[in-house]
Amino acid sequence: MLLLISPINTEEALEAIEGGADIVDVKNPAEGSLGANFPWVIRRVREMTPEDMLVSATLGDVPYKPGTVSLAAMGALVSGADYIKVGLYGTRNYDEAVDVMKNVVRAVKDQSDAIVVAAGYADAHRVGAVEPMEIPRVAADSGADLAMLDTAVKDGKTLFDFMDMEKLESFVSAARDHGLKSALAGSVGREHLKPLHEIGCDVVGIRGAACVGGDRNTGRIHRDAVRELKELLDSF
């Protein structure tokens, strides 16, 4: 299981790199769960990250505007992102989600082999977004590479407050059945890593647990916390 760490700036990115993260995921929590950062930040993080380490960029908690989102995907791509994550926030159902993702996939795959991630929300019902269990099918039918879940509302509730391990295992299995990788995030802590590993999750996304004090908003990512998480994952 790969460790994805989500820094908000170059200082945190360096901590993630030095701590041994597999994927450095540039985001901007000030703009939402999967808030987008600026192209120049993504570019600088790519420049400072070793070539054998992947850089991911979130496009935001996106609206149902396929043109806008596909153009944003190109921005992430030319900034150097290897993973391009789309938070399907404003897409209310399968059809809208596939429409957005198909256009993102076309924009990206016409230019590169970057990995496209369809990201839904375990608490989708709180924001009117497409249901989480639809995400593997959305990803597969649009030609994306990876199906992901996070939480939309960051109010202390975790992924596990909305989906139990049986449901999460079904999500991972559905992704695998479609030939996709899976990723899970949403206030994931150390205690969750082994259960997620056991259900076959491919990527785990973390910010809070890698921060000093464990707070995704007021804390800062520290290499020691990242290293401890990576060592724990490697022990499974």
From Swiss-Prot:
- Catalysis performed (reactions): 2 D-glyceraldehyde 3-phosphate = 4-(hydroxymethyl)-2-furancarboxaldehyde phosphate + phosphate + 2 H2O
| Biological processes per GO annotation | methanofuran biosynthetic process
Keywords for the protein's UniProt record, in alphabetical order:
Lyase, Schiff base
Enzyme Commission no = 4.2.3.153
Q: What class of enzyme is it?
A: lyase
* Alphabetical list of SUPFAM superfamilies matching this protein: Aldolase (SSF51569), Inosine monophosphate dehydrogenase (IMPDH) (SSF51412)
Active-site residue list = 27, 85
> According to its UniProt record, in which pathway does this protein act?
Cofactor biosynthesis; methanofuran biosynthesis
Could you say which residues form the signal peptide?
none
Pfam name, any one: 4HFCP_synth
Keyword Lyase listed: yes
Q: Which GO terms describe its molecular function?
A: carbon-carbon lyase activity
Q: What does this protein do?
A: Catalyzes the formation of 4-(hydroxymethyl)-2-furancarboxaldehyde phosphate (4-HFC-P) from two molecules of glyceraldehyde-3-P (GA-3-P).
Question: What does the sequence similarity comment in the record state about its family?
Answer: Belongs to the MfnB family.
- List, alphabetically, the HAMAP family matched: MfnB
NCBIfam families reported in the protein's UniProt record: PRK02227.1-1 (NF002573), PRK02227.1-3 (NF002575)
Q: What is this protein called?
A: (5-formylfuran-3-yl)methyl phosphate synthase
Native organism: Methanothermobacter thermautotrophicus (strain ATCC 29096 / DSM 1053 / JCM 10044 / NBRC 100330 / Delta H) (Methanobacterium thermoautotrophicum)
What's the name of its gene? mfnB
